[in-house]
Amino acid sequence: MLTITAIKAFNDNYIWVLQQTPHSQVYVVDPGDAKVVIAYLVSHQLALAGILLTHHHQDHTGGVGELKRYVEQTSSQTLQVYGPQKENIAHVNVPLNPEMRTELTLPFLNAQIQVLNVPGHTAGHIAYFIEDALFCGDTLFSAGCGRLFEGTAEQMLSSLTLLAKLPANTRVFCAHEYTLSNLKFALTVEPNNLNLQAYMQKATEMRAQNSATIPSSIALERAINPFLRVGEQSIIDSIKQHFDDPDPIKLDELTCFTRLRQWKDIF
């Protein structure tokens, strides 16, 4: 059975730990902080088998070097570090090109992992899909999506469209607890969305109890995430009103997404 556990890091990061019981070897996703990972490994008597990286940003990769040294000192093994080939991340020794290699089989996990090409937030951003779990870094957030630091709006829309087509029961493990702020924006865009209203209440209660709102699900995101709903008339009307666009012609999805991202950037 695959178990997935969150390690909190920095202000709002989640580092995900993947373990297939009864194995004591685990993988971690996007370890920006080595110290919290090592503390978790020691307290749970676990060994680190590998690291999965989604993109190059420091809050996702900053702990890799120290974790590599830790594994070499404690087990004399070479740590397997998987990451996007396009981004030349330090310590990655298994570079992944999702255009050439779309599946991985990792020791101790006993499951096929699909490697997905999801550029937008960064030029080479990738995601990992294992069983019913998606590890999507900073591409898809609950009720939101990542900023466009290196990629284009067209790339990000394509990436989000790809993720939205995953099975509805897919659990979404993004890397940040941004849900409440994203929901505030989503409700500004689509104030009459009953699913949004209900989830804002639920998420507010969860955060008041210091509970994580992650994982989300693809089904939930289809219902509440404005960036997955750019074809909905309610979203289109809101964008046209915000940007004072009287043109009666329906905006295409790319234009809607581009304007929605611009709106969110200054929200």
Swiss-Prot record:
Q: Which Gene3D superfamilies match?
A: Ribonuclease Z/Hydroxyacylglutathione hydrolase-like (3.60.15.10)
For the biological process aspect of GO, one term held by this record is:
methylglyoxal catabolic process to D-lactate via S-lactoyl-glutathione
Q: Which UniProt key words apply to this protein?
A: Hydrolase, Metal-binding, Zinc
This protein is called what?
Answer: Hydroxyacylglutathione hydrolase
Q: Which family does it belong to?
A: Belongs to the metallo-beta-lactamase superfamily. Glyoxalase II family.
Q: Does the keyword Hydrolase apply?
A: yes
Report the enzyme's class at the first EC level: hydrolase
Q: Which InterPro entries match?
A: Clx_II_MBL, Glyoxalase_II_hydrolase, HAGH_C, Hydroxyacylglutathione_Hdrlase, Metallo-B-lactamas, RibonucZ/Hydroxyglut_hydro
Q: Which domain of life is it from?
A: Bacteria
- EC no. given is 3.1.2.6
Show the disulfide pairing: none
**UniProt cofactor note:** Binds 2 Zn(2+) ions per subunit.
The gene for this chain is: gloB
Lineage, broadest ranks: Bacteria, Pseudomonadati, Pseudomonadota, Gammaproteobacteria, Alteromonadales
